[in-house]
A protein has these predicted regions:
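Membrane-proximal extracytoplasmic
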Residues: 1-342, 384, 460, 631, ...
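Cytosolic juxtamembrane regions of multi-pass inner-membrane proteins
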Residues: 306-310, 327-336, 352-354, 382-439, ...
């Protein structure tokens, strides 16, 4: 091995050139790496939505949703199918295993869609945009400064001017329009005039459809020239519609204008958008899957001037929400922690080494290792985000460990061998420590294998972190064993090393303490392990949660009214809320946006639902206290509405993973919605007295008022009417389904044949006049049974089974103990009939999955580490000795967790895994050096050798500890966006480093003496 390092030194300029090139590519990767707030946590999914205008949730479930679910359930890789059937829409989301290609899945879904038999006229299933659940990168609104345009005009301007320009931006998958009104042309039929001219409604439909068409007649040749023949019969004006002939009677044409008024109108809408008390037209940009959100937003903003120039005078675009704002805040939090950690590590290194050249070599290894990590991140498609950058921040102190060992050994041997060849001495020094350095860094990488095994949300969050730690440790290994020998040869001198004042002081205090610890080794070891078991018991009693809530520095509410609330009423509610907030908090809140109901593209919200987002004054920082105070005031002021505080990204994550808009929920499965509702209400009552439950909300799937029109077949036959005649009147005359379109350039607007006053009230609807082809006239109520009933507002399904959600808000209590107590009470007090069952969803399920996976993988990882340690030391005894150092490190982590009074979460478990790595590293450094001394001085007593070796290794052990500690401290004290997610991790690691270092220096030497006293 020595020869290998001599060759490296011989070809030193080649090695330098190689690392300069690698650093250059690494820097290029760094500046081009995609930036995002989070890793892409979206499961592989394909959404299918089917617009079925005017149809009820029950009918849509039976005729559309179920056939789609049944067809898709047999596709390869399907994990779960969620669906929601609501008035006018079927929404089916198919979740796949993550190792499938998105475009292959969309192709498979397309093939299956072609086999589904949906009844004619019930809509066409369409695949949703190829985006992620967090794909909403920009929200904006059209601002009409002079109030010159109608809501319909603004909607048309948006759809035909703004949308095409934004969709042309690379990475934009879809632009959704919301708010305003879609323009349509109305043929407003007067039933009395219709009666006078003896024309049926069916004839009007047929006339409109057949009169608006364009055909081609091939071509003719004339005078050696070819002329194309076109039959251009498309409607050009409203007069064309008015003059459309319905039928000819007594040589006189009956036209549309004889029975109807033709005018511009508004299509039925299912949602609206209000900003600061005024309705607005709103746009939502969705990024394509696997694209760079920051780049997409940047290009959208660059296109803004062009879009504003294309808009009519007086209209501008106003950005309301930009996801890169939280992205930059989150990344800035981690970047600042990384930079500050690097600076602190550099200071620590100089204070301990007290020699500029050595310190320079070690400090230089930091950026080079990080650049190698960025190069590998780019290679494997990992973005710079909150989780991946925190992995680098955790590893910042460990990066230099290998370099420290190599440089320190090289410096010592150069001083001890003044006459020997510099190249030979440095090669020998590197060869001496190469094996422990190699195995130490490999073991550190191995320690993080459990994180790579996590699945679901935990896997998507923590896998990038683990990979980044592995990448940067591989980079540091390459630097320590390839570059550092070359730099040591070029920079280190043979001058006598002067101990730093810091090290001299520490050694002065530590030496007598070490002697005492060796003298009373058995007692110290016994007390230590008793203390460990006591702390382990306390940890088992600590509350558990999946992960701390991300503070997005925003305030948002889900607002829910009673089912069946009209859209106009919801708009009034929204505007009242907006005005109240702006009046009450003029200094803190700049603007309030309300998204009511749904857009016309695959959203599933009802008219009784809205999302309210506040734009806060950038100068205002006390967001938490403001949110709590505001929530109380809103609940008091608008007692008839339900306010659920949330945040934009958090809400999308919750909905995305389980179809549940809550951190914790109970899903009730079964067939009958009334039975499920009863079970949910019973559970809510039982849970009411449990400590920590702030609010329980039963999903109100029932309660939608419906007017049922059921044909009376006997009465229809008496009047010569067909069921089809009645259904066409309901579908087109009442429901306003477009019959044809008026094309205006690239614009398309529906033409509807609407019965005048048909939807004025129920009595008017009952009195609608029907005319048979034979001329018989009758009202709707004479041939149909018309009743008002309560039906489902929506029907949710999971894997072909209906379910209902009971959402729970738990405050000031951990999720795990709450669920444990709740389960006990439910089993004792709630009667769940046969065919019905419940499941917990949300954070508890994620936490369960993560802990079960870790419980299985960590023992396997321990076995791998044991084998690596055995390979390094050729002794199971020494491997076991080093592994005994792990509990010593865990003790400090447990104490820190208990003192900070935070729950045991996946983030905290990651901290314990990091301590595992640090403890093993300390053990390897110390044990390998003791072994070296025992080989050189076989006749010296073990206890004396251990004492000398520990004192000699004091500096590298302390440097390892302090660099890791100071590397993690900025993460511990960070206060920006995302810091709360890594806080448990940094608390645990900080405590673990302190205990691991103290106990490695006090207990491990004694353990070594006890293990090898007789050898």
């Amino acid at each position: 091995m020595k020869r290998f390092f001599e060759l490296l030194i011989q070809y030193k300029y080649l090695i330098l050139a190689l690392f300069i090139a690698i650093s250059g590519f690494g820097y290029k990767a760094y500046i081009n790496i995609p930036v995002d707030a989070f890793p892409d946590i979206t499961p592989k999914q394909v959404v299918i939505y089917t617009e079925s205008a005017g149809n009820s949730a029950e009918d849509i479930e039976k005729l559309i949703t179920y056939p789609i679910e049944a067809a898709m359930s047999g596709l390869p890789g399907v994990k779960m199918i969620l669906s929601n059937s609501i008035f006018g829409l079927s929404y089916v989301s198919i979740f796949f295993e993550d190792d499938y290609d998105t475009y292959l899945l969309r192709q498979l879904v397309t093939e299956r869609l072609n086999t589904i038999d949906i009844p004619k006229g019930w809509g066409t299933p369409v695949m949703g945009p190829n985006t992620t659940g967090l794909g909403q990168v920009v929200w904006y609104a059209l601002k009409d400064k002079e109030n010159r345009y109608t809501p319909s005009q603004l909607r048309s301007i948006h759809e035909y001017t703004v949308v095409p320009l934004f969709k042309a931006v690379d990475g934009v998958e879809e632009v959704i329009s919301w708010g305003g009104y879609e323009k349509q042309y109305e043929v407003l039929i007067d039933p009395l005039r219709l009666q006078n001219v003896d024309v049926s409604y069916n004839e009007i439909l047929e006339a409109l459809e057949k009169s608006n068409q364009s055909v081609g007649g091939q071509y003719l040749e004339f005078n050696r020239e070819q002329y194309l023949i076109r039959g251009h019969g498309l409607y050009q004006s409203l007069d064309d519609i008015r003059n459309t002939v319905i039928r000819t009677k007594d040589a006189k044409a009956v036209t549309i204008q004889d029975v109807a008024t033709v005018q511009e109108g508004k299509a039925p809408r299912f949602g609206a958008v209000s900003v600061d008390g005024k309705e607005r037209v709103f746009g939502m940009v969705l990024q394509r899957s696997a694209t760079n959100a920051a780049k997409v937003v940047k290009e959208l903003k660059e296109k803004m001037p062009l879009v504003n120039a294309a808009l009519p005078k007086g209209i501008t675009l106003e950005i309301i929400y930009d996801r890169t704002q939280i992205t930059h805040k989150a990344v800035s939090t981690m970047t600042n922690a990384l930079l500050m950690g690097s600076v602190l590590v550099a200071i620590v290194l100089f204070l301990f080494l007290f020699e500029l050249r050595s310190a320079f070599i070690v400090i230089l290894s930091l950026p080079i290792s990080l650049l190698i990590a960025f190069l590998l991140m780019q290679k494997y498609g990992i973005s710079a985000n909150l989780m991946s950058l925190s992995g680098l921040a955790i590893a910042i102190g460990m990066i230099v460990d290998g370099t420290i060992v190599v440089v320190e050994n090289a410096f010592r041997l150069l001083h001890d061998n003044p006459d020997a060849s510099r190249a030979g001495v440095i090669a020998e020094a590197t060869a001496e420590v190469a094996k422990p350095v190699l195995f130490a860094l490999l073991i550190i990488a191995t320690v993080f294998i459990p994180l790579l095994s996590l699945e679901g949300l935990a896997g998507k969050l923590y896998t990038p972190m683990a990979l980044d730690i592995v990448f940067v440790m591989l980079g540091s290994l390459a630097v320590a064993l390839l570059l550092v020998p070359v730099l040591s040869f070029m920079l280190l001198k043979r001058s006598k090393h002067v101990n730093s004042p810091l090290m001299s002081g520490i050694k002065y205090i530590y030496t007598p303490v070490l002697k005492l610890s060796l003298k009373y080794a058995k007692t110290l070891v016994g007390i230590t392990f008793l203390l460990f078991f006591a702390l382990a018991y306390l940890l088992s009693q600590q509350g558990r949660e999946f992960m701390p809530e991300l503070n997005e520095e925003s305030i948002m509410y889900r607002v829910i009214a009673i089912p069946g609330t009209a859209l106009t009423q919801s708009v009034e509610n929204a505007q009242a809320i907006e005005k109240f907030i702006l009046k009450t908090y003029p200094k803190q809140v700049d603007s309030v946006l309300s998204m009511i109901g749904r857009s016309e593209k695959g959203e599933t919200a009802q008219a009784n639902y809205m999302e309210v987002l506040l734009t806060l004054n950038p100068e205002f920082k006390e967001i938490d206290s403001l949110g709590k105070k505001m929530t109380q005031q809103l609940k008091k002021k608008f007692a008839h509405l339900q306010f659920v505080p949330t945040q934009p990204i958090a809400m999308r994550i919750e909905e995305l993973l389980e179809g549940v808009s809550a951190e914790l929920a109970v899903k009730i499965y079964g067939e009958d919605q009334k039975v499920m509702s009863t079970i949910a209400s019973d559970i809510a009552k039982v849970l009411k007295g449990i400590q920590g439950l702030d609010h329980a909300e039963v999903e109100t799937q029932l309660g939608q008022a419906q007017i049922n029109i059921k044909p009376n077949y006997l009465a229809l036959s008496r009047y010569g009417l067909k069921v089809e005649d009645v259904m066409k009147v309901i579908r087109y005359g009442v429901g306003e389904e477009p019959i044809t379109q008026k094309i205006e350039g690239v614009k398309r607007f529906g033409i509807v044949a609407k019965l005048k006053d048909a939807t004025q009230d129920i009595n008017t609807l009952k009195s609608l006049i029907l005319r048979s082809d034979s001329g018989r006239v009758v009202t709707l109520k004479e041939v149909c049974d018309i009743s008002v009933i309560q039906g489902p507002a929506f029907i949710k399904r999971e894997d072909l089974s209906r379910y209902m959600v009971l959402s729970l808000e738990v405050e000031e209590r951990d999720i795990a103990s709450f669920v444990e107590e709740a389960n006990t009470k439910i089993e004792k007090n709630v009667n769940i009939p046969d065919g019905y069952y419940i499941k917990w969803a949300g954070d508890f399920k994620n936490m369960q999955e993560a802990t079960q996976t870790l419980a299985m993988i960590i023992p396997i990882t321990l076995l791998i580490i044991t084998l690596l340690l055995y390979t390094a030391f050729n002794s199971f005894k020494k491997a076991f000795l080093i592994l005994l150092g792990v509990p010593l490190g865990l003790m400090g982590g447990i104490v820190a967790l208990l003192i900070a009074d935070i729950y045991l979460s996946v983030s905290a478990i990651v901290g314990f895994i990091a301590i595992f790595a640090i403890a093993i590293l300390n053990g390897i450094v110390l044990v390998s050096f003791i072994d070296d001394l025992r080989q050189k001085f076989p006749t010296v007593k073990t206890i004396d050798l251990v004492k000398d070796a520990t004192l000699l290794r004091l500096r590298p052990v302390l440097m390892t500890a302090f660099t890791t500690l100071f590397g993690i401290l900025p993460l511990l004290f960070a206060t920006g966006v995302g810091s709360e997610i890594q806080y448990p991790l940094s608390v645990v690691v900080t405590g673990g480093i302190i205990s691991s270092t103290l106990l490695t220096l006090l207990v491990l030497p004694g353990l070594y003496v006890l293990f090898f006293k007789k050898t």
